[in-house]
């Protein structure tokens, strides 16, 4: 098949070959054939590229602004520190809002091409990162792409990056259950090793966030993706002056704990709003040297995550 038009709905869409964007496309007849069997050749390429990646972990949230990208970077730092003999990769598939280069202290780094594909950027001895943020001319450049182009970029990241031997690949996803989620799940699901792809879901305590997180949990259940558990972020705020704790986002309906009990998924732990952590993330500093209740909670959460893959 020839290259699709820019606004192609995608060969897996029910609208394939039927919408105005398909007019004049040489593949329109193929796509609109109700008897066609759609097999994305990219899936085989992804499987070959990731054959040495033991496990994959999707970091998800139905709601934007809950700190999913921040939690991804914190988990990466702590997993790498607690498992120094293991190798970790981070793939930032939040195409329109890539945050990992800043959070992991890699702003301004360049991606290099080798005979094996793109080389991800090294963060630590046992951590590497790939993000579209490395491919932009400026950190302020806007990415205005429709679904098929985003999906094509995700396929390239999965099939054309030289990830090498990884014990765990963490994928920072955009909020919701959009094209990016469907695309990455279709490429990563392996029926022969269903337990190699799992999910962690991030929320905040208030009902407006939990409402969408429930949808994300149901998305995982429908896609048969095992859920390691839920992390409640910004659960409280401890004042650095008086030491008192406050609920910035009151859990009027019981917070993540009540939701997890209702939906029968584990609660991995809770993380407070922490000015020290926020400052370190903004500057891309390693937060593993900070010792407080937040980092203690992170240690416990990371232990549960690694245990789920053993």
From Swiss-Prot:
GO CC annotation: cytosol
Residues spanning the membrane: none
Xref: CDD domains: Mrp_NBP35 (cd02037)
Binding locations of [4Fe-4S] cluster 1: 8, 22, 25, 31
Pfam families attached to this UniProt entry: ParA
Keyword terms: 4Fe-4S, ATP-binding, Cytoplasm, Iron, Iron-sulfur, Metal-binding, Nucleotide-binding
BP GO annotations: iron-sulfur cluster assembly
Primary localisation category: cytoplasm
Residues that hold ATP according to the record: 62-69
Family: Belongs to the Mrp/NBP35 ATP-binding proteins family. NUBP1/NBP35 subfamily.
PANTHER family: CYTOSOLIC FE-S CLUSTER ASSEMBLY FACTOR NUBP1, NUCLEOTIDE-BINDING PROTEIN NBP35 YEAST -RELATED
Protein name: Cytosolic Fe-S cluster assembly factor Nubp1 homolog
Organism name: Drosophila ananassae
Gene behind the chain: Nubp1
